[in-house]
A protein has these predicted regions:
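Carbohydrate-interacting/catalytic domains
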Residues: 2-170
């Protein structure tokens, strides 16, 4: 959270030197990044489906109408997970959550250096709301933004978007 690269060292926990030390002065200079990480951590806590204790089965074993976890591409419910794949959508069905929060969570990844469009699965009476767009100047939305289209999302290059599916807010 404080831009501590550890000079690429993934095992800095065992080093008592500047590689492993955290420079807390960076926190003042990067308050926006720290606020973003705090918001994402709070989002994850609020959506227990993202940290399920049960392994995902990729099937609708509780007959909620959706599998617990599904992958999506340019077409909903269809994706090729192949070598050249540059974008991917993952739908976590909130009905499988062991909490009161039953919101669906869709995480969309665009690894490509150009705009990529991913299909959004139809949610029946629910609508899609954008919560995070990593390519925006302010990536985390304090209030989820209703999507103009519930059919697809056009993602900026090399970005991650997080959407929630919930009943329409009026």
């Amino acid at each position: 959270e404080c831009f501590n690269s550890q000079k690429g060292n993934n095992n800095a926990y065992c080093q008592d030197n500047p590689i492993g030390w955290l420079n807390w002065n960076n926190a003042k200079n990067h308050a926006d990044c720290i606020a973003f990480v705090q918001a994402i951590a709070a989002f994850r806590r609020a959506h227990p489906i993202l940290s399920s204790e049960m392994p995902f089965c990729f099937s609708d074993y509780k007959t909620h109408g959706f599998p617990d976890l599904s992958y999506h591409g340019e077409n909903a419910w269809i994706t090729g997970i192949d070598y050249g794949r540059m974008s991917l959508g993952m739908l976590y069905c909130g009905a499988y959550s062991r909490s009161e929060n039953q919101e669906d969570v869709y995480v969309a990844y665009n690894f490509f250096s150009a705009v990529s469009t991913l299909a959004l699965p139809k949610l029946g009476k629910k609508k899609w709301y954008l919560v995070v767009d990593s390519a925006d100047e302010v990536p985390y939305k304090e209030s989820p933004v209703a999507m103009k289209s519930d059919a697809s999302i056009a993602m900026k290059p090399q970005s991650i978007c997080i959407l929630i599916g919930k009943q329409e807010v009026k």
